[in-house]
Each structure stands twice: as C-alpha cells, then as structure tokens.
Amino acid sequence: MSKLVLVLNCGSSSLKFAVVDAQSGEQHLSGLAECLHLPEARIKWKLDGKHEAQLGEGAAHDEALSFIVETILASKPELAAQLKAIGHRVVHGGEQFTQSALIDDAVLKGIEDCAALAPLHNPAHIIGIKAAQKAFPELKNVAVFDTAFHQTMPEEAYLYALPYNLYKEHGIRRYGMHGTSHLFIAREAAERLGKPANELNIINCHLGNGASVCAIKNGQSVDTSMGLTPLEGLVMGTRCGDIDPAIIFHLHDTLGYSVEKINTMLTKESGLLGLTEVTSDCRFVEDNYGQKEEATRAMDVFCHRLAKYVAGYTASLDGRLDAITFTGGIGENSAPIREMVLNRLAIFGITVDSAANLKARFGGEGVITTADSRIPAMVIATNEELVIAEDTARLTNI
C-alpha cells in the first residue's frame, strides 16, 4: 500500500511542492510556484509531462496552494485520494525542536517564536502550514526542521564568543541549516562507501543559492557553517557569508547606511551578486571564468572560502575523513567549482579525476577522484523531499 505525502517548502516568494511515496521514494508530482506577490506570479509542475501557468498578478501562497489542489491534483483525482499526510520543510526550529514534530497549536507557536531567527523563511512556512490545514482539513501536518540535524553539535562548535547570557537568555548561538539535506547525504554516503552510518565521517558541501558545509562525525553533525541565521558562512548567491562584524558599524556610522539598508545589502545584494555586480547566477561565473574580471573574482572568492571551510572541518573529525561530498544545485552540476575546490585541498592527498568529474553533472553522480586519491570525493544528488516524506509517514503512522 502506498504512503503518499504532500511535501511543501514555502519560501518568502515561492512554494516548492511534491507528492512522494514515503515507502518507495517515488515522486508522483513535483513543481514550483514562484514570483509570488509579484505581477509575474507563476507555477510550473511535472505530472504526466511538463506544465506551466500564470497564477494571477500578486498571487500569494494561498492562491498557489489552491491551484495545486483545485487544478493540478483535481486533474488526477486518484492521486489526490491517496494523499495520507502533509510534510513541511521549516528552516528554523531553534533549540525547542531537536527532531521533526506533528503540528499542533503548540508547535505552530514554536515556529512563530523562531521567526525572528529566520525572518525570510519561518513566516512563509507558517502561511504554508495554515493554507495546507485549510485545504486539507482531514490530513495531519508534520514540520521537519532544517536545524534539527545540527542539535548534536558540541558546545564548542555552537557557542559564539559573546557574553554567555546572550545564549542563556536569548538563545543566540549557531543553529545551522540544510540539516535535512546533510542528513540524507550522510545516509547515502554511508551506503555507497559500505560503512555503517554511525561510523561515517564526511564533510558535506550543500551548494546552491544558499550554501553550507557540515562536518559529520559518526553520522552526526558536529559543526556547520551557517549560524544563528542562514547568513553566516560560505559565499552564496546574494548572501555575504562571513564578514568582519565591524563592517556593519563602519557602514552605519561612517558611510551613513541605515540598519535596513545594511540588512538588505548583506542578504540580497552581496555574495556572487555583490562580487560580480551583475548576477547571482553561478552559471555566469563558471562560463566566464578567466575571461571576465567580475566572474573570475567571484569564483575565486567562492572557492577559496569553501576550501578553507572544508580544510578546517577536518579538525572536528578526530583525524579520519572518509569522503568529501558535494550536493545541491551547484554542488551537483558545477564541475569547475568542484575541481577548483579539491585542487586547493591537494595537501590532503586528494586528486581529481577530471573525466569522472565532468560526467558527474545534470543527474550524474559518483566518485570524482582518482583511485589513488587518499580521500575520495563524491557527487550525490540530495533528496530532501524523501526525508520529509519519511519523517511525516513515521510521525503520522501512515
């Protein structure tokens, strides 16, 4: 008997959705509503072929979910009839949620309480949850938290060197994100390396418009690059990642930037976009490397930052690193970035197999280092939707 779960991932201006069989892993439907709240709001989906439609000017999450229910699922009533539960990706669960949770009023309030830590994401998740409850009143909803996987980090990894009362009273600490993806990759890597998951040591690089690195020791997160919020760490599409905090005071006190302008700049105008002054698209950076100064500059900074994190995280693994893994839109598809990063890690005895690396794109996976490389590097496609579906099935007993 199938265990079909509707998986929802609400961003500030998007809604990613899928219908996943939690038992077989088969994806029966997938799609994305994007540009929500804007005149060009639209929805794309795969169900018996590829489809696209306009949602109407200014359409929001409610309208997108209504379209999914009344148009997409209505076109395949036998699929809609088999839905058993709904799983939601939630970016921030703070310290309150160390694992996925069946959503009730208390859980919903907890997600709302964490909104200040993920202001671009948690409010959108709440909208999605309430819209799903309205659209499917008979189905149970489960929240799967990005931060939960990282709750195994030791104190020395998650504490900031700030007055300790800021942690005790206000919960200011490193939380990390992309936990669902890091968990899936750890599981997959263990299987491919033929090791028990609880004995696996890897460093996983989840690289997309948002990006993070995670040190995984004996199958558990022991350090990760994102912090209190998704702004810390690597160079990202539009986010700055690590900077000297005093830059903020300089921008405010000396250059006269408002706090709002600084916040917008660091989250939406920095990263690859800031370095190129043209685009946040990694494909532009990759295609024009060595030809255009702005692309070369951005790619060099991106790869330097990533290699530095990977090298540093070896210190958290007690001298044993079983593999370096790449996932996410950039991690799975950018052979040049993977090669540049791994070449910077040659001190660890890593040698890239250029042919294998080129093959591991656009759905290709596998080992991308030579047989004599001391540490293997692998490309593994992430599947956060499956993890969310599995947790939802487990908590709802479907």
From Swiss-Prot:
Residues that, per the record, bind Mg(2+): 9, 384
GO CC terms in record: cytosol
Catalytic activity: acetate + ATP = acetyl phosphate + ADP
Pfam families: Acetate_kinase
CDD domains in the cross-refs: ASKHA_NBD_AcK_PK (cd24010)
Enzyme class: transferase
Enzyme Commission code(s) on record: 2.7.2.1
Residue sites binding ATP per the record: 16, 206-210, 281-283, 329-333
Keywords tagged on the record: ATP-binding, Cytoplasm, Kinase, Magnesium, Metal-binding, Nucleotide-binding, Transferase
Positions annotated to bind substrate: 89
NCBIfam families: ackA (TIGR00016)
Protein name: Acetate kinase 1
Organism, as annotated: Vibrio cholerae serotype O1 (strain ATCC 39315 / El Tor Inaba N16961)
Lineage: Bacteria, Pseudomonadati, Pseudomonadota, Gammaproteobacteria, Vibrionales
Encoding gene, per UniProt annotation: ackA1
